[in-house]
Amino acid sequence: MERIKELRDLLSQSRTREILTKTTVDHMAIIKKYTSGRQEKNPALRMKWMMAMKYPITADKRIMEMIPERNEQGQTLWSKTNDAGSDRVMVSPLAVTWWNRNGPATSTVHYPKVYKTYFEKVERLKHGTFGPVHFRNQVKIRRRVDINPGHADLSAKEAQDVIMEVVFPNEVGARILTSESQLTITKEKKEELQDCKIAPLMVAYMLERELVRKTRFLPVAGGTSSVYIEVLHLTQGTCWEQMYTPGGEVRNDDVDQSLIIAARNIVRRATVSADPLASLLEMCHSTQIGGIRMVDILRQNPTEEQAVDICKAAMGLRISSSFSFGGFTFKRTSGSSVKREEEVLTGNLQTLKIRVHEGYEEFTMVGRRATAILRKATRRLIQLIVSGRDEQSIAEAIIVAMVFSQEDCMIKAVRGDLNFVNRANQRLNPMHQLLRHFQKDAKVLFQNWGIEPIDNVMGMIGILPDMTPSTEMSLRGLRVSKMGVDEYSSTERVVVSIDRFLRVRDQRGNVLLSPEEVSETQGTEKLTITYSSSMMWEINGPESVLVNTYQWIIRNWETVKIQWSQDPTMLYNKMEFEPFQSLVPKAARGQYSGFVRTLFQQMRDVLGTFDTVQIIKLLPFAAAPPEQSRMQFSSLTVNVRGSGMRILVRGNSPVFNYNKATKRLTVLGKDAGALTEDPDEGTAGVESAVLRGFLILGKEDKRYGPALSINELSNLAKGEKANVLIGQGDVVLVMKRKRDSSILTDSQTATKRIRMAIN
């Protein structure tokens, strides 16, 4: 009671009431907020208030020796009074100006190196061109984009190791630099940043920008490569867009673009080979993009594209759990289904066996130019809300959704037979048969689908069978929306399996990807793609096949010539000769092969007829299955430059020209390499006699110890190998025969073998 009385007295005084009602400081919380803690609550105000003072800055005492007390205008730069509560001097903002003008100059050589990403950004903007601003509705969809142009693709852990090694080389802690890119970057940066005076922490931050890909999930309406994303705030608003052409490209965008092209080429090529999966892996492992191994890029690069994901799956890497159909990425957002085989009849009474999804499901569909939300039940489309850049793009999305729905009216809309095949001439599966059919012509599909009256819903309109918009009617279940559908934001990756035919499945057995989904779009890669695999020789046409085949023989001549004399069949079956067969006229392949093989056999049988140039020239022709015939040829035809060109069996031609003087071979005028020809047959009698019972394998091999003299050979066990010194101080590798019956032929072939092994 006492307290209340006291309060009432206080409030009766008008001043008290005024303070408590009209000022904002009537809350203990507010007073606390501005007075407790070390965190500055209003930095801008504090800064203004501080800078209004004469000496707002404190500095170490040493500053008094480094800066004069007054500047040229006679203004005081520092005060003799100490800063209250610290051992520092009070300094005027004018001192900063003096220091900037007259202080010691440091070397600026490291700035462009450390702040490389910023310097490059300025250059790109300087040379970029900004076009007109257009006002229109922006269909933006959120996509995961790269926000950091000009970076390498290291993982966070790899980058951390590189940064520690470059910036803090003497710090303790295990750092393992394993990948090629890690080692290269570390070496390069250590050299660049020698004697760098910039704060190590700053250097570390900047290195991180250069090494690691940073992605954000942002609303985008145009280009998604990082040089567009860095100016996103300048190029698109809610209702406007500004045209922009970047003033430079960055390697990370080029890598992404070139990776997609390489992956597409490899998947397309693998599809038509006998064992697609093995071929795909062989090509991925032997391909380089911009000088970096493709498999290293695949491990680090998060690009999601059908062909890239097939390559990743083949390498055992995890990929996104969404699946691809008709070039759209489908992600199930709710519902579930079970799969059941069902036979259906097309409008042409052709029977198709399709895997029906039974159950209610909702999907988002995201394509390059259109997006949609799809709700479906068993073989029934309930609703499709689609948005896209133009009529054409919207139509593409509608066709894919209609086929995916597996509705009966879609299957009945098929006119004519379905017999689409893939690159390897295998029939496509029924769902892709239907898709190809309607992608060619969807008129009947749209006419038979059915239309319905529509309600007026904000932001939605109807679409008619001829793909024109309408506010009254629409194709059954279909609406066109102004708003795009966001891409699936999660970066979650799942374990998948891949079969021989490159079909990728998740762990439940759902097909996520197949070669049919790989785009046929051709593009020109920004970075050089080097396919070392012979399977990719034909990508640049017949001439490239011809040159590459002969270059391969010359590069591998050492092993080729030993196989030529010992195991020709294995040599003829080498995959490197496969592309060459497409150049040889079909009718002549077998005859040429039979003729060349017979010729080679004669060379092997008759001493002294070994002719390196001729073997190299004719070898690719021997790879086809031979036909036994008595035919002789003086020239063999290959189809290049749009016509048949001749290779002379004995002698030079424009296709195959060996210059004895320079010992170089040119194929179609392109240099194919240098040849070391065999010397003339000398006296080889002695060695061949002594080397009976031994097989000559080739050049000396250090793993088998020092060279033995011919007398020491008798101690070898059957099948044992050794280096042996022969004739004029040459060393060859030999193996003691396992059977005695073959000894007779040894002395004949030994002469030739020694001669080949020495060269």
UniProtKB/Swiss-Prot annotation:
It is found in: Virion; Host nucleus. Pfam families: Flu_PB2_1st, Flu_PB2_2nd, Flu_PB2_3rd, Flu_PB2_4th, Flu_PB2_5th, Flu_PB2_6th, Flu_PB2_7th. Its main location: virion. SUPFAM superfamilies: PB2 C-terminal domain-like (SSF160453). GO terms for biological process: 7-methylguanosine mRNA capping; cap snatching; DNA-templated transcription; symbiont-mediated suppression of host gene expression; symbiont-mediated suppression of host mRNA transcription via inhibition of RNA polymerase II activity; viral RNA genome replication. One of its GO terms (cellular component) is virion component. Keywords: Cap snatching, Eukaryotic host gene expression shutoff by virus, Eukaryotic host transcription shutoff by virus, Host gene expression shutoff by virus, Host nucleus, Host-virus interaction, Inhibition of host RNA polymerase II by virus, mRNA capping, mRNA processing, Viral transcription, Virion. A motif (Nuclear localization signal) lies at residues 736-739. InterPro entries: Flu_PB2_2nd (IPR049110), Flu_PB2_6th (IPR049114), Flu_PB2_C (IPR049115), Flu_PB2_CAP-bd (IPR048298), Flu_PB2_middle (IPR049111), Flu_PB2_N (IPR049106), INV_PB2 (IPR001591), PB2_helical (IPR049113). The keyword Cytoplasm does not apply. The keyword Protein transport does not apply. The record marks 627 as: Avian adaptation. GO terms for molecular function: RNA binding; RNA-directed RNA polymerase activity. Influenza RNA polymerase is composed of three subunits: PB1, PB2 and PA. Interacts (via N-terminus) with PB1 (via C-terminus). Interacts with nucleoprotein NP (via N-terminus). Plays an essential role in transcription initiation and cap-stealing mechanism, in which cellular capped pre-mRNAs are used to generate primers for viral transcription. Recognizes and binds the 7-methylguanosine-containing cap of the target pre-RNA which is subsequently cleaved after 10-13 nucleotides by the viral protein PA. Plays a role in the initiation of the viral genome replication and modulates the activity of the ribonucleoprotein (RNP) complex. Belongs to the influenza viruses PB2 family. This is Polymerase basic protein 2. It comes from Influenza A virus (strain A/Ruddy Turnstone/New Jersey/47/1985 H4N6).
